[in-house]
């Protein structure tokens, strides 16, 4: 997957450019939230900035660092899943992570992978959450307070990322802490040590962050931006945007519920007969492995022959139901076995992982998917489903006197065809990335929009003297990074969310205070937010100010923000007219 996807991970204009540009600016001394706007916590941008300071700013610096983090995450996932499942299921789940989530592309835009993500806050948050649960597992093995403190430290760092992953990771860690203490039943002194170590370690990263940012901004502001980034998630006017309603599946609840039930029925149709057969095969004999093999062939052939007619991208919709069912069954088993640490601790870890997976799915509870945001939000649930299909459910059938491998065979066949079907989608998008954008360590493959970006970079080299500043609106900070041109305003990403949060008057004032020498308008249809074009359907005051203060000098392709045609427009500030 790494070789196949090499340099094809990012989107040429959307989201990831925001990430890499912010890291570059911070690596040169800019202050987050003051010199450059940011809606999430400060951990990820400063981590990426540190990488740029040490290894130099480039796309490949960030990509290689993220490949290393993916390897670390893979090891942690394997170690954790190995504690709650048998090796075949664990290996299969890890292969699912590599093939479906880590490197691929299942929608038109890149960015929804762990190498060039739309938000490092999310991918780093997933890693920190898994690390916290892993530290809890180490505590189960060694009973050392330092591992409880390490889990708390991971949660403290997690607070500095993104709100949804913090909620999920902290819910999982706190659940694990409570259940672990229930099993251990420590004395008062040890209880205080364990809880105190966890809480103190969790508090350290936010306190250090507050202290450092207080050196660069008023203390009140340090509380509301680096440490108060979660407040945007509570804004009702933002939550009401169609983008988030559709993403959660509440735009049309009836249709979403129907799609969920239809997908659930599909699972029952495929796996139900295998479960019944497994319950019926109670007598040992050679016929049982033969039937398991036959089941694998029949399911694989049946799905494979009609795979093009199956809505594979809808297959993740029942994940919340599956996680809820697995959680209830595991909780009952834990309550029954809580007095035996040897059997209770694996159940605690299983519950932690299920809580983490289920909490991550809340953002798309009625529209669960492994594409788009699902590359991270649905990843834990998908991996747990793999383990359940190949180990937990077959094990339950074995314990009832049945034959679990026949169910595992059906599950394996379905998973194999599903992975191949998803990889065919990845192949379609990768084949469309044939244009190289950028040079040297900044180079990556892009779709047809890459030709426009290359032309824009060439025009900037021809027309703009070195050191001249550039604003790319409403989105396209990747151009700033590739051209190494600073946007002097903090606001370089003007989607409807940013304009709701900051207000047009405030943004116009910021542009007036620090205007860019050049402006590039890039076509972007934002209909998913309920307003199609910047300057026409939203951001009118900002656009009017731009029109009054800049004049066009070159059009690249069709004029942007007019219709369905993609194009760019380069403008120069009026004061700079020759």
Put a short name on every predicted segment.
Residues 7-22, 32-50, 56-60, 448-452:
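Extracytoplasmic catalytic/substrate-binding loops of multi-pass membrane glycan-assembly enzymes
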Residues 39, 425-498, 507-529, 558-563:
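Short periplasmic/luminal acceptor-recognition loop of GT-C membrane glycosyltransferases, typified by
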Residues 64-88, 92-103, 131-134, 279-280:
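Transmembrane-helix motifs of polytopic, lipid-linked glycan transferases
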Residues 124-150, 180-185, 262-279, 286-288, ...:
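Membrane-interface transmembrane helices that cradle and orient dolichyl/undecaprenyl
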Residues 135-157, 186-200, 292-297, 347-357:
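Short hydrophobic alpha-helices at membrane interfaces in multi-pass membrane enzymes
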Residues 147-163, 169-176, 200-204, 299-307, ...:
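Membrane-interface alpha helices of multi-pass inner-membrane proteins
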Residues 167, 313-329, 342, 347-351, ...:
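Hydrophobic/aromatic-rich transmembrane helices and adjacent perimembrane loops
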Residues 195-268, 362, 419-421:
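Membrane-lumen/periplasm interface segments of specific transmembrane helices
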């Amino acid at each position: 997957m790494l070789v196949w996807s090499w340099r094809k991970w990012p989107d040429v204009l959307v989201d990831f450019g925001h990430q890499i540009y912010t890291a570059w600016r911070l690596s040169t001394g800019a202050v987050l939230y003051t010199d450059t706007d940011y809606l999430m916590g400060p951990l990820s941008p400063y981590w990426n900035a540190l990488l740029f300071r040490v290894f130099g700013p480039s796309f490949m610096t960030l990509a290689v660092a993220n490949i290393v983090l993916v390897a670390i995450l893979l090891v942690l996932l394997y170690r954790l899943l190995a504690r709650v499942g048998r090796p075949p299921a664990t290996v299969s789940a890890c292969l699912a992570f590599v093939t479906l989530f880590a490197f691929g592309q299942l929608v038109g835009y890149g960015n929804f992978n762990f190498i060039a993500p739309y938000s490092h806050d999310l991918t780093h948050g997933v890693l920190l959450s898994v690390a916290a649960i892993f530290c809890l597992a180490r505590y189960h093995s060694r009973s050392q307070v330092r591992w409880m403190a390490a889990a708390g430290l991971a949660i403290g760092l997690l607070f500095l990322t993104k709100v949804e992953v913090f909620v999920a990771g902290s819910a999982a860690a706190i659940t694990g802490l409570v259940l672990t203490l229930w099993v251990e039943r420590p004395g008062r002194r040890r209880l205080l040590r364990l809880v105190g170590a966890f809480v103190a370690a969790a508090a350290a990263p936010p306190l250090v962050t507050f202290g450092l940012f207080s050196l660069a901004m008023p203390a009140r502001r340090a509380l509301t931006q680096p440490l108060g980034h979660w407040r945007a998630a509570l804004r009702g006017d933002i939550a009401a945007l169609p983008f988030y309603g559709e993403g959660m599946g509440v735009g049309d609840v009836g249709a979403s519920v129907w799609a969920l039930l239809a997908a659930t029925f599909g699972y029952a149709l495929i796996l139900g007969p295998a479960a019944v057969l497994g319950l019926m095969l109670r007598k040992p004999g050679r016929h049982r492995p033969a039937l398991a093999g036959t089941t694998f062939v029949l399911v694989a052939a049946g799905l494979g022959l009609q795979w093009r007619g199956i809505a594979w991208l809808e297959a993740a919709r029942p994940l919340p139901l599956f996680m809820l069912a697995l959680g209830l069954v595991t909780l009952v088993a834990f309550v029954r076995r809580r007095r035996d640490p040897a059997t209770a601790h694996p159940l605690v870890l299983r519950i932690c992982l299920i809580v983490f997976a289920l909490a991550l799915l809340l953002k798309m509870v009625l529209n669960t998917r492994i594409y788009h945001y699902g590359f991270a939000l649905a990843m834990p649930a998908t991996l747990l489903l793999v383990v359940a299909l190949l180990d937990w459910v077959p094990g339950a059938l074995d314990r009832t006197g049945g034959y679990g491998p026949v169910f595992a065979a059906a599950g394996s066949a379905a998973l194999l065809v599903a992975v191949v079907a998803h990889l065919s989608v990845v192949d379609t998008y990768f084949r469309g990335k044939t244009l190289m954008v950028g040079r040297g360590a900044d180079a990556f493959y892009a779709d047809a929009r890459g030709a426009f970006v290359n032309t824009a970079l060439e025009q900037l080299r021809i027309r703009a003297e070195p050191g001249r500043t550039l604003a790319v609106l409403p989105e396209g900070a990747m151009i700033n990074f590739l051209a190494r041109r600073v946007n002097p305003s903090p606001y370089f990403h003007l989607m409807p969310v940013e304009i709701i949060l900051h207000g047009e008057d405030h943004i116009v004032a910021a542009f007036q205070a620090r205007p860019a020498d050049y402006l590039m308008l890039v076509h972007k249809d934002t209909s998913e937010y309920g307003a199609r074009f910047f300057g026409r359907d939203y951001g009118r005051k900002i656009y009017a100010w731009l029109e009054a203060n800049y004049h066009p000098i070159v059009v690249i392709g069709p004029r942007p923000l007019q219709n369905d045609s993609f194009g760019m427009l380069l403008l120069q500030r009026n004061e700079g007219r020759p």
